[in-house]
């Protein structure tokens, strides 16, 4: 072949392709905003259909239902004046243990349950002040305990590996799950919901009064659980309440790119 050109000769065409992709995405965002706004016009009519649609967007394992009530395995860590502290595991899926800290109040047998959800780089031990300081969590779990409710602080795939060990790659996990029709957000939402199923079965828990409180990424999961789980009656989302019109670039690049938004 005799025709030769400079390696930048087709840059204008490449730029056109790139810019076209960006325009397409922006147009889809505009359409999605209109669709989201329309979904609120008849709220709460059709809430079950909307909840099923949200699960379908997120993918497996939310699309397969919840099944029976899983067993809670408890290991006693401490007996404090007002509560007993356990490290617990729930088999959220076959062969997959999901762990957390469970603070059971002493005294009156039946009480509400509040989930205390840590954020990015956190652990239940950190947000619950077991490490001596709760840093930016401002004693979150301990403050929830002062309400008189039982508190459950679970671990999601977000801990700081330099501080807490056990390396992982959340983005790779999410990519592999998407190959299977799911997402890491769907998996962890399912784990949290299965934990609620398990803990609701305890004699001391009032299954009609379950709430969620989370900081940062935990706040994101708090909002998600409020949408997905009819057992969640109240939610506090700290530093994560967004309608997606606020700093969309940061949202996509730093946090919730694992989730499909529509």
Give the positions of each predicted feature.
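Glycine-rich active-site/cofactor-binding loop and its immediate structural neighborhood
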Residues: 74-132
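Mobile cap/lid helix-loop segments that gate and shape the active-site cleft of serine hydrolases
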Residues: 178-179, 187, 232-262
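Cap/lid segment of the alpha/beta-hydrolase catalytic domain
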Residues: 109-110, 114-196, 201, 246-250
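Alpha/beta-hydrolase fold nucleophile elbow
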Residues: 204-216
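N-terminal targeting or regulatory segments adjacent to alpha/beta-hydrolase or S9 domains
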Residues: 1-84
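Alpha/beta-hydrolase-fold catalytic nucleophile elbow
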Residues: 155, 213, 238-239
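Alpha-helix C-terminal capping segments
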Residues: 227-231
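Glycine-rich nucleophile elbow surrounding the catalytic serine of serine-hydrolase chemistry
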Residues: 214-226
